[in-house]
UniProtKB/Swiss-Prot annotation:
One of its GO terms (cellular component) is photosystem II reaction center. One of its GO terms (biological process) is photosynthesis. Its main location: plastid. The chain crosses the membrane at residues 6-26. Signal peptide: none annotated. InterPro entries: PSII_PsbI, PSII_PsbI_sf. The gene is psbI. This is Photosystem II reaction center protein I.
Amino acid sequence: MLTLKIFVYTVVIFFVSLFIFGFLSSDTGRNPKRKDIE
């Protein structure tokens, strides 16, 4: 059961980080001053 919980937490953290990364990249897309991140 512990392995399942660790797996679920890993998937949740993965999707949350994907969402945050997509939000930040779309934010830099609208902000022309932050082109150096690419």
